[in-house]
Amino acid sequence: MIEYIKGEIVELTPTRMILECGGIGYELNISLNTYSAFGNKTTGKIYIYEVIREDAHLLFGFAEKIERELFLLLTSVSGVGPNTARMILSSLPPSELVQVIGSKNEAALTAVKGIGLKTAQRILVDLKNKVKPMESMAGNLPEASVSNGAVTEEAVAALVMLGFQKAASQKAVSAILKGSPTLAVEQVIKTALRML
């Protein structure tokens, strides 16, 4: 099991990071929160969770241990896989997710793509008591900003990687930026995730 990798950030998109360590480039699947935390950095330490399947070995990276712990809790719920857990963590920062689960807020969970009412209820029931110890640890991850010229392109690319259609993603991102042109890419994506 890999606890963390420390190295140079070679490539960073809202859903993926390439981290070079010891001459090896590790491809990491990341959430939007992790992207925000590493937005302007060239090196970093990222916590890892490894998923081994018959057809693939995947690495999921997290800026903070609490985000990884929430990921593990989410994937322990029946019907929630790694990509769905990443989608939830991209839509809700760790502190907000802990609050949502603690207050049994079904609406906030069903607003996430791929989460229906039954899955949301299952998450709330299964994790209600497990997140209580995390409430004191939960804090907002630092936010990073990206130049406005790349916001549309990056946001659309991230939404497409998360499984949304390109046309719908472009329409949502354009509408968001029309109303708030100074938003950072991660805020645009979070808003779009709630719209789509």
Curated annotation (Swiss-Prot):
Its main location: cytoplasm. The lineage of its organism: Bacteria, Pseudomonadati, Bacteroidota, Bacteroidia, Bacteroidales. Residues 1-63 are annotated as: Domain I. Residues 64-142 are annotated as: Domain II. Belongs to the RuvA family. It is found in: Cytoplasm. It comes from Parabacteroides distasonis (strain ATCC 8503 / DSM 20701 / CIP 104284 / JCM 5825 / NCTC 11152). The gene is ruvA. It comes from the Bacteria. Residues 142-146 are annotated as: Flexible linker. One of its GO terms (cellular component) is cytoplasm. Homotetramer. Forms an RuvA(8)-RuvB(12)-Holliday junction (HJ) complex. HJ DNA is sandwiched between 2 RuvA tetramers; dsDNA enters through RuvA and exits via RuvB. An RuvB hexamer assembles on each DNA strand where it exits the tetramer. Each RuvB hexamer is contacted by two RuvA subunits (via domain III) on 2 adjacent RuvB subunits; this complex drives branch migration. In the full resolvosome a probable DNA-RuvA(4)-RuvB(12)-RuvC(2) complex forms which resolves the HJ. GO terms for biological process: DNA recombination; DNA repair. Disulfide bonds: none annotated. This is Holliday junction branch migration complex subunit RuvA. Keywords: Cytoplasm, DNA damage, DNA recombination, DNA repair, DNA-binding. Residues 147-196 are annotated as: Domain III. GO terms for molecular function: ATP binding; four-way junction DNA binding; four-way junction helicase activity. The RuvA-RuvB-RuvC complex processes Holliday junction (HJ) DNA during genetic recombination and DNA repair, while the RuvA-RuvB complex plays an important role in the rescue of blocked DNA replication forks via replication fork reversal (RFR). RuvA specifically binds to HJ cruciform DNA, conferring on it an open structure. The RuvB hexamer acts as an ATP-dependent pump, pulling dsDNA into and through the RuvAB complex. HJ branch migration allows RuvC to scan DNA until it finds its consensus sequence, where it cleaves and resolves the cruciform DNA. Has three domains with a flexible linker between the domains II and III and assumes an 'L' shape. Domain III is highly mobile and contacts RuvB.
